[in-house]
From Swiss-Prot:
It comes from the Bacteria. This is Energy-coupling factor transporter ATP-binding protein EcfA2. It is found in: Cell membrane. Keywords: ATP-binding, Cell membrane, Membrane, Nucleotide-binding, Translocase, Transport. It comes from Oenococcus oeni (strain ATCC BAA-331 / PSU-1). Forms a stable energy-coupling factor (ECF) transporter complex composed of 2 membrane-embedded substrate-binding proteins (S component), 2 ATP-binding proteins (A component) and 2 transmembrane proteins (T component). The gene is ecfA2.
Amino acid sequence: MEILFKNVDYIYQPNSPFQFKALTDVNLKIESGSFMAIIGKTGSGKSTLIRHLNGLLKPSSGEVKIGNLTITSSIKESQLSDLRRKVGMLFQFPEQQLFADTVEHDIEFGPINFGTTKEKAKKIARESLKKVGLNDEFLNRSPLELSGGQMRRVALAGVLAVKPDILVLDEPTAGLDFIGKKEIMKLIKKLQLEEHTTIILVSNSMEDVADYAEEVILLSKGKVIKQASPNKIFSNKEITSALGIETPQTTVLAEFLLERGVDFKGSLPINEKSFNNFLKKIFEEKKKTRIL
């Protein structure tokens, strides 16, 4: 489902002494089946923005269009139930979303809540657990017995159990070690590529953004500053420096080499893959020179 924000403002506690405008004239487009990252400093409006995607928040003005549904300030809660099945939300530290006595019961909760029979929910729980790389042995275990990485997988399985078209993730790898982060991000990318799930990632890890996102929305003080490819965002040092956005370590290394005369012949590499491709071209050119 395509996502459109048109002139969206959001105000917390309007018409009170504590009124605060969190989003200002937000216009953006997220293509169906794409992998979009949302970045920005703390307080830039990231969390407020993603809460509009399943109607947890409604625009103070403007509209959010998701598929055929248009969300405005006047939309009724009864009109949002189908949307909330189609848009899965995984918040920061998703293990805090685990509440049932067993992994199976936790994953079954969503499908049953949306009207699925207990028998079918059991089948869905097994399928969802398999998708996140865990076997049936985990079904009868307490979520509290699991490691941090396993808890993240179970929480993700619970969201996937309702078969969302859109998956919104708020810092899904926060607190995990390097291996755990890689496993979770590869799993999320796999969902996008194999099941055509639209992925919307909020992250402070610019490495994750550079490695996995196809496009980036940069927010500052509730406004969209730029929407572009990761390469265009991270190669624009004027914007990243002004807004205090860290660049990926690969780009930092590339900038260091650029200052010392290395010609990258175009945009700077932003991740390990693009840097390795650059090195490969250099070696191929040297081989040709030797042959000549």
